[in-house]
């Protein structure tokens, strides 16, 4: 009996020790923002990197990668095995790091460099990797992985080790000397950046010498709003820095150099009076990815926009009357489009000075110039219900706009003024087609629909519409509306052909693997079968809410930026040798 008791006691003791050890070695998730500088322009995090990989590998787009390389899909490790490795730290060190890692990316500065006559934006930033594993264990494999990355990226880089304030830095410098990878390891944290300054900024925060982004009260609010704690990835731009990003982005949109300090100051000063923080999160959705965005607006701006930001109650037949192929199409569904236009101008103008109001009005007006509309207020007052803008090719050189007719006579006067006195006209069915003397623009006007675009596109559209009310095949419509139906309740819905982004993504993956596509024809055909992305935009309580559902989400844009692309594996070279 005594022996049995001792056996029970020893057994309980062993179980208690194992349980205590498991509790002790189990890593606790942390808020990665604690490592990000409070002054960060942009912050991205992924607390479940393996879930991101599983989601991407499970998409229909990734199956094309397997077909392109002729490889069979690789079975992913079982969830219980990943959990065991992550919990205990038992296993190959590479697997332990992957199972335990939390990632964050910070952009600390937006610099500009001149490339001939082109001014390029060159962000400075760093990747933060919390491995939840001791430095002595992670240092060798991390340094080896970074060395391979530098060799893939730069060819024959120069390696250099330096010590600053007692912390070792490792640099791999490209042969031309203008690019570099800088890294340091502090405890379980790995910091990798494209400049020493970016790495040192993050290091200072991790050593508690500088304040962190975690102290920003808007960060947690944005996480809650976008379900960031359950997301594959989460991104945040502090309200204090969103104007700075706009000061770089707006000049590029307007065709001005970001180096124009006076214009940037104008945008920065006034953007803060309109915009707040920005947020993004990504989630799995129907063998694809859903990206959610929140563009915060100041309360006064939201209050001004709300009354007229109402969706049109009726859906007209123009929703199905598209050309036989479009690169992208955007629906604007408002009861009164002209009132919404006026509200946009008034809401922004009421928050800024006179000069900035003029600049904003010019920027807003230019949005419709590419469609041949130079009097937005008059045009929008003469149309009703749904309004469609279409880009027939990726570069936007061929564009169209289609709208329902509210006032046919007003539209006729606008058309005559826009096309000039020497315009030519004829009729196709019940539509009058007018074309300018240079053959650059044409307008088709009937009692129900007005169409603006190039003469060839407008005529082709009008002739097709006269025969059938539905111009696209049902299979094409299903592909376009796969992620979002025409009946979406959003005010603005955009459908976009993602083929080019996916092709670039696949090229980057092939480059990383060091392989080439087996054949271009079948691969391009498979990419063409993927559904269009769909973006729904509404005005919520905090600002503009955008939800994009697509084959790969923003990962198709972000991954090619991280993976160096080798010569011969570009979009035009997805082919066999």
What are the residue ranges of the model-derived segments?
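Structural boundary/hinge residues at secondary-structure and domain interfaces
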Residues: 6-171, 221-275, 290-395, 415-420, ...
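Short, surface-exposed beta-strand/loop micro-motifs that present aromatic residues
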Residues: 105-118, 178-187, 387-392, 438-447, ...
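A conserved glycine-rich beta-strand in the N-terminal activation segment of trypsin-fold
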Residues: 179-251, 437-519
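Solvent-exposed coil/turn segments that connect beta secondary-structure elements
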Residues: 47-49, 132-134, 187-189, 195-197, ...
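Short, solvent-exposed coil/turn segments at beta-strand boundaries
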Residues: 133, 184-190, 288, 396, ...
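Short, Gly/Ser/Thr-enriched beta-strand-loop segments that form substrate-interacting elements
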Residues: 163-178, 429-438
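Extended terminal
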Residues: 4-8, 453-454, 481-577
